Amino acid sequence: MLFAKAFQSATVAGAVILAALVDVAHSTPLDDPGQCGLEAVAQCCTSLRESAVGDKVFAYGDIEYFRAKRSYYSVTTSLNSACIVLPESAEDVSTVLTTLTQPDLAETCPFAIRSGGHSMVVGFSDIAAGVTLDLSKLNHTIYHPETETVSLGPGGRWVNVYEELRPDNVMVSGGRFSSVGVGGFLTGGGITIYSAQRGLACDDVVSFDVVLANGTLIQATNATNPDLFHTLKGGSGNLGVVTNFEVRAFPQTQIWGGYTSYNVSKTPELARTLQNFTSNIEQDPKALLVTFWTYDTLTDVNRAANAMYYTDPVEYPEAFNDYYAIENISSTVHTRSIESLVTELEDTTNWFRVLFVTLAFKNDARVIEHGANLYQEYIDTIKANVSGGDWLVIAGFQPMPTLFGTSGQENGGNIIGLENNGDKIVLLFEAFWERTQDDELFEPLADELIHNLEEYARSLEQDSDFLYLNYADGWQDPISGYGGDNIEQLRAAAEKYDPNGVFQTQVPGGFKISKVPVAEQKK
């Protein structure tokens, strides 16, 4: 049974929060592709098979096709594409793009781009009746001691990156959940355990190798194509296909961290302490945490918990003193490697139905506590109406201080705009369930929770326009919260590097700059 290993453990909090740290419906079942009307795009796959990547094109019935489809994080996001392409080089990606954007194919060959397949939004990393460009074989991790940088492929997974770098005794800013892919994480921003010290993960990128919509291979750095370089840091899939990230390396140390669980009666204390921690994060930027509430059917236990991280091997650092004073139920905190942390009780959520939805608000304990109360109402409603099967709900609140933005500005900054409008708290609300018939229960209720919490924050003048792109659901609009100047920079870069709008229209999935009205730009 899915989740059984994690939930039978006394340290269930580990598996729960790991899902909350990923840096995100409905799905057509993975059966006969004829159901999806794939005949309309058959010529797209034929043209690809006749190109230089012909031996890397796979369709329904091929083992590679099913292997790729079964590797998506959520059953809801694996769709019946007409074929998938598994490029092994930037040149292969160029061939795919030049083939699919030919004038006689462009209007009938929609395609999706997949790095790790960890998006929870249907159609963002796969496509029904189209072509999926699967970057999973571009998964290299190469350390360059002469430049103190690491080359990363977009199809890598962060746990593999960390493992491959261990012999070199270096580290990079990366994901906190082992199965998250490199590509989407970095182009969406990337919250890491080092963010209070180094900014978002994208701020540690020193160059991008990019294939443009017309197949051109270019490099973007602070000196070469600087507008593209800047806007790729938060621009998601609006600009091109990144085939290599060159990122800064720094000395690897063990870290202190783990998961501590509490009775939900501690909710007011946890909310106040999270507000205080966020307000004082500059006093010790080596410390970071997430506070969350969770319920699962296998234990039938409702609990609160913290995931705490300290980026030096210091036992019980003073930055968390307020938390030590709160009575806990269990704890796994100890000094360990980052691989140990990101794989602790690695969950097995593949083929569960999954949703992510997010909200940000100003750092205020009242809003945090109200969010925890709304989560409890959500749990009660699900219990009363669910058809059956196992399910899990998580409401995770984490600091998003201005420090995440100002620290990154030392390396050129990004277009996300965290340095604006004060310290924030980001909520990632997640639900995992088994049965298709419960889609119409879990999803609308989650959206309602977000709307209700947003209204409450607004009533206290604690609301925020910001939404973290890597946590957002498909109906949300994270790019519109970047701020007017940043939005305009991204719009200009998209028009310059993709003048035909391939990544706006021919790639239907993803958050599009073209869908952000000019009127929504805010300084």
UniProtKB/Swiss-Prot annotation:
FAD-binding PCMH-type domain segment(s): 77-252
Class of the enzyme per the UniProt entry, highest EC level: oxidoreductase
One Gene Ontology term from the biological process aspect of the record: terpenoid biosynthetic process
Disulfide bond entries: none
Domain of life: Eukaryota
MF terms (GO), sorted A to Z: FAD binding; oxidoreductase activity
Keywords associated with the record: FAD, Flavoprotein, Oxidoreductase
Listed Pfam families: FAD_binding_4
Cofactors demanded by this protein: FAD
EC number: 1.-.-.-
UniProt-listed Gene3D superfamilies: 3.30.465.10
InterPro entries attached to this UniProt entry: FAD-bd_PCMH, FAD-bd_PCMH-like_sf, FAD-bd_PCMH_sub2, FAD-linked_Oxidoreductase, Oxid_FAD_bind_N
Alphabetical list of SUPFAM superfamilies matching this protein: FAD-binding/transporter-associated domain-like
Extra remark beyond the main annotation: The various drimane-type sesquiterpene esters produced by the A.calidoustus drt cluster include asperiene C, asperiene A, (6-Strobilactone-B) ester of (E,E)-6-carbonyl-7-hydroxy-2,4-octadienoic acid, ustusolate A, ustusolate C, ustusolide E, ustusoic acid A, (2'E,4'E)-6-(1'-carboxyhexa-2',4',-diene)-9-hydroxy-drim-7-ene-11,12-olide, RES-1149-2, as well as the 3 newly identified compounds calidoustene A, calidoustene B and calidoustene C.
Family: Belongs to the oxygen-dependent FAD-linked oxidoreductase family.
Main function: FAD-dependent monooxygenase; part of the gene cluster that mediates the biosynthesis of various drimane-type sesquiterpene esters, compounds that exhibit diverse biological activities and are widely present in eukaryotes. The pathway begins with the synthesis of the backbone drimenol by the terpene cyclase drtB using farnesyl pyrophosphate (FPP) as substrate.
PANTHER family: BINDING OXIDOREDUCTASE, PUTATIVE (AFU_ORTHOLOGUE AFUA_1G17690)-RELATED (PTHR42973), FAD-BINDING PCMH-TYPE DOMAIN-CONTAINING PROTEIN-RELATED (PTHR42973:SF53)
Official protein name in the record: FAD-dependent monooxygenase drtC
Organism: Aspergillus calidoustus
